[in-house]
Amino acid sequence: MNYVWYASYGSNMNQDRFSCYIEGKQAEGSSEPERGCRNCDPPLADQPINIQYPLYFSKQESKWGTGGVAFIGHREGENEKTAGRMYLISEEQFMDVASQENGIDGLEIDFARIKESRFLPLTEGWYGTIVYLGDCEGKPIFTFTSNHDMGEEEFVPPSFAYLKTIAKGLETLGMDRQEVVDYLLEKNGINGFIKGDLLVKGLWG
């Protein structure tokens, strides 16, 4: 069995939330359960990752309610610091997770081809482009994002149900609450849409 790292940068940084995609459960704050993977074994490992692509929020409505969800842009930058958590899962599990994120069945991925191209659109779903981010401990790192680059679609602030899940994930990466707020306030889709005091109240009451 071949394994790859799946790098998450949105709600899947929260390990409890990501396990719903593996095991077929409903995440707290979500309106519907996930289908789950054919192989429900937990990740072999997980660890933080710094992704050098910009994080932003877009789209209008999802299982998290009205509001945007997280994507990364297509242009790498040394000064871009998107926090993430990556999970060591099988290639089959990665394909199953990507299928669920795109609302389809049976997405087939040629991982070698993606390594060559770095960005490869495979479906018209919200997360239809698979991205190769490099290697760690001899295994390739992949994630997925929109087929559209940052700025090609309008920025939309996310729901607090969604942001709470992201905040929990950021806290597990070692951020304190002020660091979580400072991090999120810089991101397109939050910057200029949600003020700091409202963000604090929405996340923690």
Where are these regions (language model features)?
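Glycine-aromatic micro-motifs
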Residues: 1-205
